[in-house]
């Protein structure tokens, strides 16, 4: 990102739009989480948009509200965190007015504060060294590096212990099909993955074997 791009804290109304509008605006944004261990901040480089009921076959809200996706229907600017594949947590920014399910999955980021803490979290018990580009490259890795867990589901991203700053200028970005989404939702009709070209922290595209279209 150019050094002349400034960051500012948005109002909640910045997230009232659909995830399709909010997703590219989050590229270059900085998400900060301060836990008991200390702060970690990430510059977002890759996201995916998911919309609501009956509109997006790749969305958790496609068939309506459940206990699991309740936060997705909540106040915009909050966190929707969920457990996936029996082992990983993923983090999303809730968009659209409350009652309309819409969210942006955080897929990749660069650590810009708290690098040592992010490295310890990602190394875990193994203590192995993780390349810096891989610390938050992919949604599950991003969550671990940031210290986000299921207990944060529904948390306000615009208030402590979180903080979210948006760039003053929209950076150039690329789009394409979403990663690992099965069925039509993973096809070319839903090019709702957005990323900053040339950023090392952007995860490689992986087509789901059951995606089509």
From Swiss-Prot:
Protein name in the entry: Putative 3-methyladenine DNA glycosylase
SUPFAM superfamilies: FMT C-terminal domain-like (SSF50486)
InterPro entries in alphabetical order: Formyl_transferase-like_C_sf, MPG, MPG_sf
Entry keyword DNA repair: yes
EC number: 3.2.2.-
Coiled coil: none
GO molecular function list: alkylbase DNA N-glycosylase activity; DNA binding
Pfam families linked: Pur_DNA_glyco
Family: Belongs to the DNA glycosylase MPG family.
GO biological process: base-excision repair
Enzyme class, UniProt record, top EC level: hydrolase
Organism: Leifsonia xyli subsp. xyli (strain CTCB07)
Keywords: DNA damage, DNA repair, Hydrolase
